[in-house]
Each structure stands twice: as structure tokens, then as C-alpha cells.
Amino acid sequence: MAAYNAPVSNCQFRLTHILPIPQRHGAPTDPFQMNAIRQQSDSAEPLRHDIRLLGRCLGEVIQACEGKRVYDTIETLRRTAVRFRRAGDPADDKLLQARVKQLRGNDPNSVARAFSYFLHLSNIAEDRDQNRRQRERALAGAGPERGSLRQAIESLKAQGVNNARIRRLLSEACVMPVLTAHPTEVQRKSTLDVHREISSLLVQRERELTADELSELDLALIGQVATLWQTRMLRYTRLTVADEIENALSYYRSTFLNVIPRVYGDLARLLNREPVKPFTPPPPPLEPFLRMGSWIGGDRDGNPNVDAATLERALLRQATVLFEHYLQEVHALGAELSASTLLIEADPALLALADAGGDDSPHRRDEPYRRALIGIYARLAATARHLTGQKLARRATVPAAPYDTPDALAADLAVIAASLSARHGAPIARLRLSGLQQAVTVFGFHLATVDLRQSSDVHERVLAELFARAGDGIDGQAVDYLALDEAARVAGRELAHARPLASPWIAYSEETASELAVLRAAAAGRARYGRQAVLQSIVSHTETLSDLLEVLVLQKEAGLIAPPGETIAPGDGLMVVPLFETIPDLQRGPEIMAAWLDLPEVRQRVRLAQGDTQEVMLGYSDSNKDGGFLTSNWSLYQAERALVDVFSARSVRLRMFHGRGDSVGRGGGSSYDAILAQPPGTVAGQLRLTEQGEVIQSKYKDAEVGRWHLELLVAATLESSLAPQAAATSAEDAHMQQHAPAMSFMSELAQRTYRGLVYDTPGFADYFFAATPISEIAGLNIGSRPASRKKGQHIEDLRAIPWGFSWAQCRLMLTGWYGMGSAIEAYLETGAQGAPRSRRARLAQLREMASDWPAFRTLLSNMEMVLAKSDLAIAAGYAQLVPRRGLRERVFGAITAEHGRTLAMLRLLTRRDLLADNPGLMASLRERFAYIDPLNYLQIELIKRHRAAQRRAGDDADIRVPRAIHLTINGIAAGLRNSG
């Protein structure tokens, strides 16, 4: 343990080489690119320093905890990997693989942990560097950063958009990140907590420090890294839904509860015509347009572990965490607002609130704000006990009745704010009160809106059972609902019947009973915590109009919607949201929505209950798995344009819900650029998008990073919604008229190429399950939902998320590029109908699309990032895991050829090397490859051992082997910074 007290520089685990480490496919030769790398190297000195510091800390910890032999083994592997990445000598690559194969006993686990933790530490340093650069830019007086709220507001004002228009949009807007518990989050909460502490210590080291203070911080850093090393990286039991709920709530405590009110405050200041003066009253809270959503506890699609109890738990735990925050803030306000009426007057309304608070202490007789806050605290505490039953850490000192609604709490806080502002207390109100006021308008008593989601075939079976058990069927006719065609189902007018289908005296199947219980729990949750607690019912695999109508009938059974004949009130029921996922569903989506909105009973509900707003969700994951990268993106784009036309013709506001993941194959990439690249009219102030897996922790584990990502979402929504639409629409129409035939041609060819490999190649499923760690991922305990919908090795049954995760692990990233090369090449060679006649002219057209059309430019940019992370030499090692040589050569040969073709076509269109225009990302990747490579080689070797042991004994006799595999999965995901 003496090493912990030694200077940080004593022992060096030198995972610290930053720039430049060439990629396998060659170092950059473009002089402009080399100059960019040199500039990046100069500006990366603070980042380099932090990574060296953390690397030295890790080295000390490893040597102290594991001994010099293990440390030397790790360092030898590191040096070999770095040497190969620098010089590209194949002998070093072979030596690295040979040394990995020699690892025995516990050494594979130690090596996997060492490289994984260094990549985690690098991520912490990079996130900190992003914050540092933004601050340095502001201190230097540079213009507002692209994607910032300031840049968005200034840009809009320069285009003639005034504050009134911005405020009008915000009053009706909806920007909602939705946290989901999809199984790509491979980090434990325990390690994330340590990450936050390390990040905080790095921030503290940037201050001007004495030698003693610096030494103390360095000791604290080593202590945190030692904690990380001695904390189990893996979960040995599968996550439960309750675990996932708690994991998500940790981000509210660390980020959302404090940061979201700050984003509102920043925006309010930017919209203020005059510079903020200290004693000018702060503006009232903005209308709540930025809110949080969640699928955790309500997403039943394919997860048998989600039911009414998990929904109730999610709502309860959310409210509990929220009231803890409110009570803490009100208590802190009581300490801050010490103004005395002996020194300054207070408003009569404030005095009345103080008198009603019940505090009769003579020590506070002249302190009306404190007396009022004691009463508010007591009412909040009573509300918390009433709604959640929680035991409070700090009891109220006076008895009080609970608040009925968040508006009542907001009204009391407004009384305090008004009195302060009228009595020269505006600067005091800004300290804490304004943020709490905004928080109450945003979070209410519910914290986040929990969506319900279920597959359409489940709804269909439930309704069929209800009809069968009711006896009189549809319109009084006994029928087999499942046997009806679509026309007969739509013709059923069950919504108009007042009588219930379900009976409390009938024992229904487990599935039907569970679905009805979930809907009843949603109704109870809305009554308890407010309607915002549950707002949407998402229908996965929406293929027909009846898929949506069935959910309305089930809501009627659960008492969620007004009975027939009663007035439909605003907010009545849950909005039925179709989820279009596959390529055929995306193509049918606009037609289904037109029919939906044309139904009189639906149109009335949309108008009265939903404020003329209808949400549509688009699935990026399944459409990609179904049709490949290009076809998925093009189908999504066409569907959005068609939906805009459908909704515009019916004067209904369209809200798009984007089911994006963190990998490009699942719609990942820059959220800001993706929003700006949406077709004109698709945003219009309405945006929901999923935040999944590694994205949640990378974006929101740190308050400042989280604030920036929320700012990006709001800024992009404002710019996309309010920038003059006429020119944008005209330009988009011109692009579509000129380039849609080319896109459709390439999309069809890309889909044919992709499906030819994935679905039409005999034995492809066997190849995939052998050449990727998909089987090992299934045992990683990283989510409550199974990796496959059914047992067996069929690509069709595999969920899209582990599908993408597996391709990322073996460094192929196939979901983010496959088929593009063939599509572009075919268009250049043959062209589509109406295309330019010569190859040169077609190439000029594609280059114009790449430079001028945001949709195509963003597509290529995302693909470029994926290709930069791919590595065929590593992937070839995974291919060797396939026992059948013919299958291995056939499939990997096709992948290799398409990879080379896609790289060549991308270079042809962009006329530059990969990521030449993004030296920062390129530098980060070049640094990481030398530390990801050993993990990949180790994973391959361990999978061989694990599968061989399973064949011999039916199980692995040495539990260390599968655990080491899981450690490599964790590290590779951290190194690539996206996974599934």
C-alpha cells in the first residue's frame, strides 16, 4: 500500500501516447491533413497531460495490487501494440497475437481490466477536455460555438426571427430525450460513480494550487483509481428492471435535476432584450418544453420482466427521487432567505403565506421568508408521504396538508419570488429560487414521462380473448377476431359500445391479465402523480390501422379514456403512437396515418385530447437490420417527407419520435447534425428521441457534458423549426427532384446486396454466431431483456441491438456501411433512369449530393466515422472462429470485398482520406487503436478456449475465461465509444 503514498510520477503504466498512431490502412499523406494533425497535437497538450496523469495512476495501482510481473506483462503488450500501430510492421502484430495467446491463469483478466480501465480513464479525460475547450473559447472572446444556444439565437435573429416568434414556438414545443434500458450499457453504476469522482478531481487540479494542495489531489486521484481497480467491473447477476430504474435515476441526481433548469435559465437570458441587471426581476419560468422521458418500467415489447408492478415501481421511485430534491432545495432556501422585516419590508402576500405556514418560533418572528418556507417544506413533506410513503431524512417541524398539484407548489414559490423582486431581492432569487421554480414547471410531481410500449401482436391476442370471452363478439356477433381480415376489424365499432368487454369475474390468460393490469396501473399512476406521468402507448410492429384501434379499445377497458358519449377533455387517455420499424412498415406508414387521422372518432380525439398533435415513432434499429444502412436511412427520410404531407393536409401537428441508438447503424452520430438534416417541416418544435446504452453515460454522467448535449438538442430544434422555411423547402424539393431517382436506385441495390449477404447466403447465421461474440454478449448480464425474441440461431429472431453490438465488437461495424460501396459503384457504372448519361457526370452528381444535400452529407459523414473504426485485420481473426472453411471464406470474402469497395467509393466522392476534415476525432481514434487491439486479440483467444471447453464438458470449467471475455467486451465498447 506504500505505493499509494508515493508521488504520482514514480511508476509509469505508460498508456499515454496520444498522436499520431497510424491506422492499418495507412498514415495520412495529404499535407493539409498532416498540418491539421500537428495543430491538433499542439492544442491537445492539456488532454495529453491528463491521460498521462491517469495512466501513471493506473500503473501505480496495478504494480501495487498485482505485482511487478503482471505489470511488466501488461506493459510489454502495450509497447508491442503501440509499436505496430506506429510503424505498421506485421511482425509486431504477429508478436502481439503470440504474446496474448501465451496468457494463462488470471493474467488474461488482469490484462483485460488494465486496458479496459485505461480506455475508461481516457474517456473521462476526453470529456473533461471538451468542457475545457468550450471554456477556453469563451474566455478568448471567440464567437458562439456551433450547436450552442447562443449561436442558434443569434443565427435566427440574423435571419429575421424575433424573440416573440421564438417564445411562441417554445410555448408549444416538445423536446424530450427518452432514456431506455436497452442492453448495450456495459458499465456498472459503481464504476460510473468513481468516474464522476475522477472527473471532479481533474477539474480541481486546473485551479491554481499550492504544492500541498496538488499533492493532496494526486493522492485522491490514486485513491479513486485504486477504488476503480478494486471494484468488480462485471455484474455476476443479470440486471433486473428495478436495477435499470435505479441506474437511470442516478443521472437525474447527477445531471438532469440541476442542469435542465440551468438550460432554461440560459435561454431566458438570451431571449432578454437587455443585458441582465442585478436588481431586475428574473423572468417567470418558461413554459416547459424540455422534459425527460423514460421507457424503463413501461417497455414490455419482448421483455417478460416488465409488468404492472415495474411500472408502479418506476413511477414511485421517480417521484421519490424528485421529492428528495425538492425538499433539499427548499431546506437550502430556508438557510439562504434570511431577510428580516426589521431591515426590509415584505409583500402582504408573502406575510400571509408566512403566517399560514404554522411556524411560531420567536427566533424567526421577523424572518417571513423562512417562516413561509417552513410551511412550504411541511406541505411538500406531506405530499411526499402521501404520494410515495417515503420516510424523510429531515422531518417537517409543523403539521401541514399536502399539495394537490404542482401548480399549487409553484404558486407558493411565485409569492416568494414576487416579494423578493419587489424588495430589491432579485439577485437573491437568482441564487436558487428561480431554478427551483423552473424545476417544478418541468418535473411536476412525476419527474419523467414513462412510455408504455408493446408489440401489436400482443394487443391483437388480448383483444381476441376479450371478444371470445365476452360472448357477444363485435357488434353483437360472435366472431374469431384473429381470423378477421383487416376490413372487418376496422369495421368493428367496439369503441362506440359503452359496455365493458372485460369482466372481473373471468380468469383470463396470463398475457391478457398482465396487459390489462399495466393499463390500469397507468391510469392509477396518472391519477396519483399527474397526467404527465404516462402520456404515450407505443405500438411496436405497427403494420395496419387496426393495430392502433386495438389500443384505444384496450384503453377503454382500463378506464383511461372517456366512455362513449362523454366529453373528451384535454389530456384524456394515452396517445396511441405507431412505431414503424421495418422497410415495408416505413413505406406503409404514411398511408396508415392518413387512414388513422381520417377516422371521425380518432380525429375528434386528436383535436380535443391531444391538442391537434399526433406522434409517430420511427425505428432505426430494425429498419437497418431489415434492409441495411442506406435503405434504412432512405426509407426513413422518404417516410418523414410523406408524413409531413399527410399531416399538413389535415392540419395536425406532427411530432416525430426517433428511435435512435448509439451506433450509426441504429441512427447514431451527431444528434445536432441529424436534427438539422431532417426534411423541412418534420421538426417544427416537436422532437422526441431515445437515448440508449453507452450514449446515456457518455452524454449525461457529467453535469457539464450533459448540459452541452441538452443545449445541442434545443438549439438544433430551434434552428430547424424557425429558420426561414421557404428557401429550405425549395432547396429540399430541388434536391429530391434531382437526386431522388439516384437515391432510390442506390437504395434498391444496397438492400439487395445487404440482404443477399445476411438473409440469402446459406449458413450466414452460423457464420455470425461463430465469428462474433453474440453468444457471450447474451451472458453478460447487461440488461433485463433477452438478446433474442426466440430461442435458436436465426437472424430474424435476434434483436437489432445485440446484432449491432456484436458487429462493433469484432471491429467490422457492418451495420453502418455494408451495401453502400456496391450501390455507389453500380450507379456510377449504369445509372438510374433519367440519370446523367456519362460516368463522369454521374460522379459529379454524387459529389454535389455529398457537398450540398444535408441528408446525403450526414449519411456519408456517419458512414465515414464507422469505417474509420473498422479493422479488417482484426475482423479476420474473428472469422477464424468459424469452423467451416468454405463458409468462412465465402462470407468474409464478401465482407472484405464490400469493405474495400465502400472505402474506394467514399474516397472517390469526398476526394480525401478518412476523417481528414475531423482531425480531433481522427487523433482520438489513432490513440485508442493500440489499446483496443490487445483486447480484440485477447477476446478472440478466450472465445476459442471457452467454446472448446464447452464442447468438451458442456460448460467452462474455469469461470475466469468467460469473465475475461466479458471484461474485453466492456473495454472494447469503452474504446469505441459506441456499441450497439
From Swiss-Prot:
Gene Ontology CC entries for this record: cytosol
- Provide the family line: Belongs to the PEPCase type 1 family.
Q: Which UniProt keywords apply?
A: Carbon dioxide fixation, Lyase, Magnesium
- SUPFAM superfamilies to which the protein is assigned, alphabetical: Phosphoenolpyruvate/pyruvate domain (SSF51621)
Q: Which InterPro entries match?
A: PEP_COase, PEP_COase_bac/pln-type, PEP_COase_Lys_AS, PEPCASE_His_AS, Pyrv/PenolPyrv_kinase-like_dom
Task: Give each disulfide bond as a residue pair.
Answer: none
Which transformation does this protein catalyse, written as a reaction?
A: oxaloacetate + phosphate = phosphoenolpyruvate + hydrogencarbonate
One Gene Ontology BP term is: tricarboxylic acid cycle
- Name its co-factor(s): Mg(2+)
Q: Which source organism?
A: Bordetella pertussis (strain Tohama I / ATCC BAA-589 / NCTC 13251)
Catalytic machinery residues:
H182, K625
Tell me if GTP-binding is a UniProt keyword of this record: no
Question: EC class of this enzyme?
Answer: lyase
A Pfam family assignment = PEPcase
Name listed for the protein in its UniProt record: Phosphoenolpyruvate carboxylase
Q: What does this protein do?
A: Forms oxaloacetate, a four-carbon dicarboxylic acid source for the tricarboxylic acid cycle.
Name the PANTHER family for this protein.
PHOSPHOENOLPYRUVATE CARBOXYLASE
Among the GO molecular function terms of this UniProt record, one is: phosphoenolpyruvate carboxylase activity
**Enzyme Commission (EC) number:** 4.1.1.31
